[in-house]
Amino acid sequence: MAKPGETIVNTVTGETLTFQKTASMTGGDLLEFHLQLKPGSTVPMKHRHTRQDEIFEVIRGTVNVEIGKTRHVIKPGEKILMNKGVPHRWWNSEAVTSELIVSFKPAADTEDFFVEIFGLASSGKTKPNGAPTFFQAARMCGKYNIYHPVIPVFLQKAVSLIFNLFDKR
């Protein structure tokens, strides 16, 4: 369980995340964290959340966001909403570190997802770009309700269930 003020780092993608409001603090209503993106930082794959909205508020630099097929450049003071179910991805194409506040409503167990994926990447257990391996993604998608945008969700849930039944970690 994450704690406010706790910082985690993904050494592969160049992200530094500091938890501000956690699920336990907000009764599960909200997860909020400060995110720093080094130049070239990117989420390694487009994805969608089936149970949560995600909001970015840029503090410094700019963040490129693709929601569905539409691309946006978000500047300091601007916010953007990624509605649940809509595929999205983001990246920092600038030469400076970008900073933003990221919110998930409701919180669900998303903080656990970030702790897990940052840990896997920083331990060299993901693909070189920081994306989870097929087996990691299959196990985590149903656990955290984060899905690939093209493969039917019901199929991803079934595969995730099977993988989690046999997970020997």
Predicted region positions:
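Short amphipathic
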Residues: 32-36
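Jelly-roll (double-stranded beta-helix
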Residues: 1-30, 41-52, 62, 66-169
